[in-house]
């Protein structure tokens, strides 16, 4: 429908310890030492991608995800998606804070022009933005050592800057 802008929304944590995947090691090296941060520190982001053209919006969340932080991101998304006057429908999962009473009245007030559509429970594979998170991890975090959490955020945000304008890569990645 050309009168609707469909957005995919989700939140993610990028861990400091990174991940190792395929790599090449010279045959003469018996046991390569691979640096790996031993903790469970992570940096969180809200993200949304407009499926029509790949326009994206990302927001770092330094504390935790909850109803207040989600509401702040929804307001930011509403502002970013108003440029063309289309109705905005946002695909989201069933996290408890997506249904919070805190922003229920706000959502009801905007229901005609800005609404949330929830995925079935326990089905993250149906959310197109999950593929964006996977690509971000592969491009920014695989086979890399991050001695500080700030370096993880820096690496991820460089990718987000590359995706800041509507682009074909995200549009193709998020095709339904």
Residue locations for each model-derived region?
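C-terminal anion-handling pockets and recognition modules
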Residues: 2-6, 129-176
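Acidic/histidine-rich, metal-coordinating catalytic segments
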Residues: 10, 85-99, 122, 127
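Distinct, well-ordered alpha-helical segments
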Residues: 101-106
